[in-house]
A protein has these predicted regions:
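A structural helix-start
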Residues: 11-20, 40
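Short beta-strand-to-loop acidic/aromatic patch adjacent to the donor-nucleotide binding site
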Residues: 86-98
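Conserved catalytic core of nucleotide-sugar-dependent glycosyltransferases
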Residues: 100-182
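C-terminal catalytic/acceptor-binding lobe
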Residues: 157, 162-164, 172-173, 177-251
Length: 251
């Protein structure tokens, strides 16, 4: 039997502009043994109700004012769901990316525990791939190196230090070792800390450079993150008991 895969994604109502196109694609992937779970962290229940009306399995979690907390809480709900329901892989796919219909087969074909596609993100002052081969920090941000493109051109399956959760498949063995986290006082998102934990544990991470995924990015989320960066400085660092999820009934 083919590995059992859960396609999971945190969502919120700021992605309403793309959600129907995203759902149309994920409902029609060619892989034979996958399920879908979207976890809504919007402030109201309206977006979750819309997703449910489109025939998608959705869970609504209690709102938290901090956007970084919302993401980690949502992603850990998905992680726990994978482990508790016998899935072999968590396919993390962000809802503003539209992958090819055979994306799961292409990722599984590499037989790696952590492997993803890639996409461009808008990061002032340049547009760059959302991945890194080495940890190079400038002003507490990961710095982009232009020679990355040369490496990508020469290597189909490239070993990296950091991919992203935008399009990545993770084996349950890895999820059993690593719980998603963030540090409120730091600017980096939870996927950065996941890949740092992979490095610490000697877990290899790969990106298929052939799998460039269209990314329909907006900037509402960027503004939320900027707002939270200011607020985060007033708060304490990551504490596991501050990141518990609570399911909300949308019926």
């Amino acid at each position: 039997m083919k590995p059992k895969v859960l396609l999971g994604c945190p969502v919120y109502d700021g992605k309403d502009y793309i959600i129907e196109r995203f759902i149309d694609r994920i409902k029609n992937l060619t892989y034979e043994n996958y399920d879908i779970l979207l976890v809504d962290n919007s402030k109201t229940n309206d977006f979750a109700k819309k997703i449910k009306s489109l025939g998608i399995n959705v869970v609504k979690l209690k709102w938290d004012e901090n956007s970084k907390k919302r993401l980690v809480i949502s992603r850990n709900y998905i992680r726990d769901y994978v482990l508790e329901n016998g899935y072999d892989y968590f396919f993390s796919l962000e809802c503003d990316l539209v992958p090819p219909r055979d994306i799961i087969e292409k990722l599984l074909a590499h037989k790696k525990k952590v492997v993803g596609g890639w996409y461009y993100i808008c990061a002032i002052p340049y547009i760059r791939p959302c991945l890194a081969r080495e940890w190079t920090l400038v002003n507490m941000q990961f710095a982009f190196k232009e020679e990355l493109f040369e490496k990508m051109a020469k290597t189909k399956l490239m070993k990296v230090l950091q991919g992203s959760f935008g399009c990545c498949i993770i084996h349950r063995d890895i999820l059993e070792q690593i719980r998603f986290k963030t540090y409120i006082t730091m600017p980096h998102p939870e996927d950065t800390w996941f890949y740092l934990d992979c490095e610490k544990k000697g877990i290899e991470v790969y990106v298929d450079t052939d799998l460039l995924i269209p990314h329909f990015q907006d900037y509402k989320w960027d503004e939320l993150v900027k707002k939270n960066k200011i607020e985060d400085l007033k708060q304490m660092k990551h504490k596991e008991d501050e990141f518990k999820y609570e399911v909300v009934d949308i019926n």
